[in-house]
Protein backbone atom coordinates (compact mmCIF):
# COMPACT_ATOMS: atom_id res chain seq x y z
CA UNK A 1 0.00 0.00 0.00
CA UNK A 2 1.41 3.38 -1.01
CA UNK A 3 2.01 5.91 1.76
CA UNK A 4 0.89 8.76 -0.50
CA UNK A 5 -2.47 7.07 -1.13
CA UNK A 6 -3.08 6.56 2.61
CA UNK A 7 -2.25 10.18 3.40
CA UNK A 8 -4.85 11.33 0.88
CA UNK A 9 -7.69 9.34 2.42
CA UNK A 10 -6.91 9.28 6.18
CA UNK A 11 -6.07 11.69 8.97
CA UNK A 12 -4.87 10.76 12.46
CA UNK A 13 -6.50 12.05 15.65
CA UNK A 14 -4.73 11.72 19.03
CA UNK A 15 -6.74 12.92 22.06
CA UNK A 16 -4.74 13.99 25.12
CA UNK A 17 -6.65 15.30 28.12
CA UNK A 18 -4.77 16.87 31.00
CA UNK A 19 -5.63 15.72 34.51
CA UNK A 20 -5.30 11.93 34.71
CA UNK A 21 -6.51 10.72 38.09
CA UNK A 22 -4.39 7.55 38.45
CA UNK A 23 -1.08 8.80 36.99
CA UNK A 24 -0.24 12.50 37.09
CA UNK A 25 0.55 13.86 33.59
CA UNK A 26 0.21 10.30 32.27
CA UNK A 27 0.66 11.12 28.58
CA UNK A 28 4.02 12.73 29.35
CA UNK A 29 5.29 10.24 31.91
CA UNK A 30 8.95 9.61 31.07
CA UNK A 31 9.95 6.11 29.99
CA UNK A 32 13.60 5.77 28.92
CA UNK A 33 13.74 9.58 28.91
CA UNK A 34 10.91 9.74 26.36
CA UNK A 35 7.33 10.84 27.14
CA UNK A 36 4.64 8.18 26.74
CA UNK A 37 3.24 10.09 23.74
CA UNK A 38 6.56 9.67 21.94
CA UNK A 39 5.97 5.94 21.40
CA UNK A 40 2.78 6.62 19.43
CA UNK A 41 4.45 9.50 17.57
CA UNK A 42 7.41 7.32 16.56
CA UNK A 43 5.19 4.64 14.96
CA UNK A 44 2.57 6.84 13.29
CA UNK A 45 5.16 9.07 11.58
CA UNK A 46 6.49 5.99 9.79
CA UNK A 47 3.21 6.05 7.85
CA UNK A 48 1.73 9.54 7.92
CA UNK A 49 2.93 13.00 6.99
CA UNK A 50 3.01 15.30 10.00
CA UNK A 51 0.46 17.62 8.40
CA UNK A 52 -2.08 14.78 8.73
CA UNK A 53 -1.48 14.07 12.44
CA UNK A 54 -3.64 16.08 14.86
CA UNK A 55 -3.32 16.31 18.64
CA UNK A 56 -6.34 17.59 20.57
CA UNK A 57 -5.57 18.73 24.10
CA UNK A 58 -5.89 21.27 26.90
CA UNK A 59 -2.35 20.47 28.06
CA UNK A 60 0.45 23.03 27.40
CA UNK A 61 2.89 20.10 27.23
CA UNK A 62 0.93 18.65 24.29
CA UNK A 63 1.03 22.01 22.53
CA UNK A 64 4.78 22.24 23.09
CA UNK A 65 5.27 18.66 21.83
CA UNK A 66 3.19 19.40 18.70
CA UNK A 67 5.21 22.53 17.96
CA UNK A 68 8.54 20.77 18.50
CA UNK A 69 7.67 17.89 16.16
CA UNK A 70 5.61 19.97 13.69
CA UNK A 71 2.31 18.17 14.32
CA UNK A 72 -1.11 19.81 14.03
CA UNK A 73 -2.58 21.03 17.32
CA UNK A 74 -6.18 21.71 18.41
CA UNK A 75 -6.89 23.64 21.61
CA UNK A 76 -9.58 21.57 23.24
CA UNK A 77 -12.23 23.67 25.02
CA UNK A 78 -12.62 23.31 28.77
CA UNK A 79 -16.15 21.97 28.26
CA UNK A 80 -14.64 18.93 26.49
CA UNK A 81 -12.00 18.30 29.17
CA UNK A 82 -14.18 17.23 32.07
CA UNK A 83 -13.99 13.77 33.67
CA UNK A 84 -17.29 12.86 32.01
CA UNK A 85 -16.31 14.24 28.58
CA UNK A 86 -16.45 11.74 25.72
CA UNK A 87 -13.74 11.29 23.11
CA UNK A 88 -16.48 11.38 20.47
CA UNK A 89 -17.26 15.01 21.39
CA UNK A 90 -13.58 15.92 21.00
CA UNK A 91 -13.57 14.27 17.56
CA UNK A 92 -16.63 16.26 16.48
CA UNK A 93 -14.92 19.45 17.68
CA UNK A 94 -11.80 18.48 15.69
CA UNK A 95 -13.78 17.86 12.49
CA UNK A 96 -15.55 21.22 12.79
CA UNK A 97 -12.54 23.23 13.99
CA UNK A 98 -10.17 21.97 11.29
CA UNK A 99 -12.86 21.61 8.60
CA UNK A 100 -11.82 18.01 8.01
CA UNK A 101 -12.69 16.74 4.54
CA UNK A 102 -10.61 13.55 4.64
CA UNK A 103 -12.71 10.42 4.03
CA UNK A 104 -11.52 8.57 7.14
CA UNK A 105 -10.22 9.22 10.64
CA UNK A 106 -7.78 7.05 12.61
CA UNK A 107 -8.15 7.41 16.37
CA UNK A 108 -5.04 6.53 18.38
CA UNK A 109 -4.65 6.71 22.15
CA UNK A 110 -1.22 7.66 23.52
CA UNK A 111 -1.81 5.08 26.24
CA UNK A 112 -1.14 2.22 23.78
CA UNK A 113 2.66 2.50 23.44
CA UNK A 114 3.25 -1.05 22.15
CA UNK A 115 1.07 -0.57 19.08
CA UNK A 116 3.33 -0.68 16.00
CA UNK A 117 3.20 0.89 12.56
CA UNK A 118 2.67 -2.65 11.24
CA UNK A 119 -0.45 -2.95 13.44
CA UNK A 120 -1.78 0.36 12.13
CA UNK A 121 -1.10 -0.53 8.49
CA UNK A 122 -2.72 -3.94 8.92
CA UNK A 123 -5.82 -2.32 10.36
CA UNK A 124 -5.97 0.21 7.50
CA UNK A 125 -5.62 -2.57 4.92
CA UNK A 126 -8.45 -4.61 6.43
CA UNK A 127 -10.63 -1.49 6.63
CA UNK A 128 -10.05 -0.80 2.93
CA UNK A 129 -10.15 -4.38 1.62
CA UNK A 130 -13.43 -5.26 3.38
CA UNK A 131 -14.94 -1.85 2.53
CA UNK A 132 -15.82 -1.24 6.17
CA UNK A 133 -17.46 1.76 7.80
CA UNK A 134 -15.50 1.27 11.02
CA UNK A 135 -12.96 -1.06 12.59
CA UNK A 136 -11.35 -1.48 16.01
CA UNK A 137 -8.40 -3.43 17.40
CA UNK A 138 -8.62 -6.40 19.76
CA UNK A 139 -6.53 -9.16 21.26
CA UNK A 140 -7.71 -12.75 21.55
CA UNK A 141 -7.52 -15.20 24.43
CA UNK A 142 -9.39 -18.02 26.12
CA UNK A 143 -10.59 -17.08 29.58
CA UNK A 144 -13.03 -18.01 32.33
CA UNK A 145 -14.96 -14.77 32.77
CA UNK A 146 -17.45 -13.97 35.51
CA UNK A 147 -19.82 -11.07 36.17
CA UNK A 148 -21.14 -10.05 39.58
CA UNK A 149 -24.72 -8.75 39.66
CA UNK A 150 -25.40 -7.39 43.15
CA UNK A 151 -24.47 -10.40 45.29
CA UNK A 152 -24.87 -13.09 42.65
CA UNK A 153 -22.10 -14.42 40.38
CA UNK A 154 -22.71 -15.34 36.73
CA UNK A 155 -20.28 -17.16 34.45
CA UNK A 156 -20.35 -15.34 31.10
CA UNK A 157 -17.76 -17.05 28.88
CA UNK A 158 -18.44 -20.64 29.93
CA UNK A 159 -20.97 -22.88 31.66
CA UNK A 160 -19.58 -23.53 35.14
CA UNK A 161 -21.90 -26.57 35.47
CA UNK A 162 -20.21 -28.14 32.45
CA UNK A 163 -16.69 -26.76 32.62
CA UNK A 164 -14.53 -27.27 29.52
CA UNK A 165 -10.77 -27.45 29.27
CA UNK A 166 -9.29 -24.01 28.57
CA UNK A 167 -8.07 -25.10 25.13
CA UNK A 168 -11.60 -26.20 24.17
CA UNK A 169 -13.24 -22.88 25.04
CA UNK A 170 -14.40 -20.34 22.49
CA UNK A 171 -12.10 -17.39 21.88
CA UNK A 172 -12.79 -14.18 23.80
CA UNK A 173 -12.05 -10.91 22.00
CA UNK A 174 -10.93 -7.97 24.13
CA UNK A 175 -11.18 -4.45 22.69
CA UNK A 176 -7.73 -3.02 23.48
CA UNK A 177 -8.31 0.66 22.63
CA UNK A 178 -5.18 0.86 20.46
CA UNK A 179 -6.72 1.61 17.03
CA UNK A 180 -10.09 2.81 15.78
CA UNK A 181 -10.75 3.75 12.15
CA UNK A 182 -14.04 5.13 10.83
CA UNK A 183 -15.58 7.03 7.95
CA UNK A 184 -15.77 10.75 8.70
CA UNK A 185 -19.22 11.45 7.26
CA UNK A 186 -20.85 8.52 9.04
CA UNK A 187 -19.15 9.41 12.31
CA UNK A 188 -20.81 12.83 12.10
CA UNK A 189 -24.15 11.08 11.58
CA UNK A 190 -23.86 8.43 14.32
CA UNK A 191 -21.58 10.33 16.75
CA UNK A 192 -20.02 7.00 17.65
CA UNK A 193 -16.72 5.34 16.72
CA UNK A 194 -18.25 1.94 15.82
CA UNK A 195 -21.12 1.85 13.34
CA UNK A 196 -22.41 0.47 10.04
CA UNK A 197 -20.44 -2.40 8.57
CA UNK A 198 -17.67 -3.06 11.10
CA UNK A 199 -15.10 -5.68 12.03
CA UNK A 200 -12.11 -6.05 14.33
CA UNK A 201 -8.38 -6.19 13.71
CA UNK A 202 -6.47 -8.69 15.82
CA UNK A 203 -3.27 -7.59 17.56
CA UNK A 204 -0.84 -9.56 19.70
CA UNK A 205 -1.67 -9.43 23.39
CA UNK A 206 1.88 -8.19 24.03
CA UNK A 207 1.19 -5.18 21.78
CA UNK A 208 -2.14 -4.46 23.47
CA UNK A 209 -0.96 -2.98 26.76
CA UNK A 210 -3.09 0.01 27.79
CA UNK A 211 -1.52 2.37 30.33
CA UNK A 212 -4.30 3.09 32.82
CA UNK A 213 -2.53 3.00 36.17
CA UNK A 214 0.94 2.76 37.74
CA UNK A 215 0.88 -1.03 37.50
CA UNK A 216 0.46 -0.83 33.70
CA UNK A 217 3.22 1.76 33.48
CA UNK A 218 5.60 -0.45 35.45
CA UNK A 219 4.76 -3.40 33.19
CA UNK A 220 5.67 -1.34 30.12
CA UNK A 221 8.92 -0.10 31.68
CA UNK A 222 9.91 -3.68 32.56
CA UNK A 223 9.11 -4.81 29.02
CA UNK A 224 11.56 -2.26 27.61
CA UNK A 225 14.43 -3.36 29.85
Predicted region positions:
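Active-site acidic Asp-centered loop
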Residues: 108-110
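A short, N-terminal amphipathic alpha-helix
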Residues: 36-52
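Hydrophobic targeting segments
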Residues: 9-14, 37, 52-55
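N-terminal nucleotide-binding beta1-loop-alpha1 segment
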Residues: 1-24
Amino acid sequence: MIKKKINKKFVVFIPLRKGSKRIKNKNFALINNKPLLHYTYKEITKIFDKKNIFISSNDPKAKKFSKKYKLQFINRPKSLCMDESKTEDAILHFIKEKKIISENIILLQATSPMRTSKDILGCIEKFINLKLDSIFSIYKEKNFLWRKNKKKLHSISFNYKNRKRAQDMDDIYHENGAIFIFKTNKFIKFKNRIFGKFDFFEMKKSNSIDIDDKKDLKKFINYLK
